[in-house]
Regions:
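DNA-recognition alpha helix
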Residues: 32-43
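Amphipathic alpha-helical dimerization/coiled-coil segments
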Residues: 83-99
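Short, Lys/Arg-enriched N-terminal segment that forms or immediately precedes the first helix
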Residues: 1-9
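Basic, amphipathic "hinge/linker" alpha-helix immediately C-terminal to the N-terminal HTH DNA-binding motif
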Residues: 70-88
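Short, leucine-enriched amphipathic alpha-helices that occur as contiguous helical runs
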Residues: 13-20, 48
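Short capping segments at the starts of secondary-structure elements
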Residues: 15, 23-33
């Protein structure tokens, strides 16, 4: 596999939490629409099972809260999640400057 392909996989499907926290930072997102939203905004279509796993872990660790929106499961990024997202952005900025 070419290096760019490995890199693309690691920063997309390998780090779904970044995309979930980003999408849910301003509005609640329904679980069933997350794949489509990620595809529309970030250009890749993640596996549904991976999304469920990431949501479970993010909720368990307090990075997202689980809500009901129109009777369906939805998620919103918590303050803890926003801080984690800001830390990731800072890390990426520093890394890009070093490259």
């Amino acid at each position: 596999m070419e290096p760019i392909k490995r890199f693309t996989n690691s920063v997309s499907e390998g780090n779904l939490w970044i995309y979930v926290l980003s999408l849910a930072k301003e509005v609640e997102i329904q679980e069933e629409t997350i794949s489509r939203l990620i595809f529309e905004k970030f250009g890749f279509l993640p596996n549904e099972l991976m999304i469920k796993t990431v949501l479970f872990r993010l909720k368990k660790d307090g990075y997202v809260s689980k809500e009901k929106l129109a009777g369906k499961k939805s998620y919103k990024t918590t303050e803890k999640g926003l801080k984690e997202l800001d830390s990731m952005k800072s890390y990426c900025s520093n890394l890009i400057q070093k490259l």
